[in-house]
Swiss-Prot record:
Belongs to the UPF0173 family. Keywords: Hydrolase. The keyword Cell inner membrane does not apply. InterPro entries: Metallo-B-lactamas (IPR001279), RibonucZ/Hydroxyglut_hydro (IPR036866), UPF0173 (IPR022877), UPF0173_UPF0282_UlaG_hydrolase (IPR050114). It comes from the Archaea. It comes from Archaeoglobus fulgidus (strain ATCC 49558 / DSM 4304 / JCM 9628 / NBRC 100126 / VC-16). PANTHER family: UPF0173 METAL-DEPENDENT HYDROLASE MJ1163, UPF0173 METAL-DEPENDENT HYDROLASE MJ1163-RELATED. This is UPF0173 metal-dependent hydrolase AF_1265. HAMAP family: UPF0173. The keyword Chloroplast does not apply. NCBIfam families: PRK00685.1. GO terms for molecular function: hydrolase activity.
Length: 231
């Protein structure tokens, strides 16, 4: 599987299908591509905050790609003439050659509508994406929580995409603890250096993982760079 970081929490997973996650491109100073340049078969949105929902509707319309998200958010997005697949915690959607399992995240998840009103958009989530024998865990925005150990035991992800930026999510110490709980083979940090409040040096994360003695490869990507994971 080819994993490309598009800045912030946005990733493109490519194998037999193209799966786009949290496509915050417009307004993202680190985005390496424009929304109209992205091709996707499915779009996953972890929650309704603007820096995660991002350009999902526009990209979905252009690619005729379903948006997979929590049920309440799917009902809101369906008003914009896009196909949605509303899920809930613990459920798995099997579609095409992929399986997407929704898992909890510890965050908030409201949505600002076009009139500036704050409305409920369901719970925040993470996703386990299984494609071509590889399992990727995108945590969404979250703090570390003990049930991550269960997620690791149940799903055994190969690659974990997790925030390190602090302030709005867990920081480096929390992310290291999350790796202890989940035990992936590879960790790719995200949700940092987009804005001043989440400025972090990812090398500090790598050093902290090494200092803890964890058997996890830390892969640091620049926006637009890719990593290939093959079993």
């Amino acid at each position: 599987m080819k994993i490309t970081w598009l800045g912030h929490a946005a990733f493109l997973l490519e194998g037999s299908m193209k799966v786009l996650i949290d496509p915050f491109l417009t307004g993202n100073p680190n985005a390496p591509v424009k929304p109209e340049e992205v091709k996707a078969d499915y779009i996953l949105v972890t929650h309704g905050h603007g820096d995660h929902l991002g350009d999902a509707v526009e990209i979905a319309k252009r690619n005729n790609a379903p948006i997979i998200c929590i049920h309440e958010l799917s009902r809101i997005l369906s008003r914009y003439d896009v196909e949605t697949m509303g899920m809930n915690m613990g459920g798995t959607a099997r579609t095409g050659s992929i399986a997407v399992t929704m898992v909890p995240a510890w965050h908030s998840a409201d949505l600002e509508d076009e009139q500036g009103n704050i409305i409920s958009a369901g719970l925040p989530a993470g996703f386990i994406v299984s494609m071509d024998g590889v399992r990727v865990y995108h945590t969404g925005d979250t703090d570390v929580f003990l049930d991550m150990q269960l997620i690791g035991e149940l799903h055994r992800p190969d690659v974990m995409l997790l925030p390190i930026g602090d302030y709005y999510t867990m920081g480096i110490a929390g992310a290291v603890k999350a790796l202890e709980l989940v035990k992936p083979k590879v960790a790719i940090p995200m949700h940092y250096n987009t804005f001043p409040l989440v400025e972090k040096d990812p090398e500090d994360f790598r050093k902290a993982v090494k200092a803890k003695g964890l058997d996890v490869e830390v892969v640091i990507l620049k926006p637009g760079e890719s990593y290939e994971f093959n079993k």
